[in-house]
Amino acid sequence: LFEENGGAL
């Protein structure tokens, strides 16, 4: 999944 800041989890 991708957070709002664009960081991939």
UniProtKB/Swiss-Prot annotation:
Subunit note: May bind to Rho-GTPase.
UniProt entry keywords in alphabetical sequence: GTPase activation
Known function: May keep Rho-GTPase in a GDP-bound form.
Protein known as: Rho-GTPase-activating protein
Organism of origin: Rattus norvegicus (Rat)
Induction profile: In response to ultrasound associated with a high frequency electromagnetic field.
GO molecular function terms attached to this record: GTPase activator activity
Signal among keywords: no
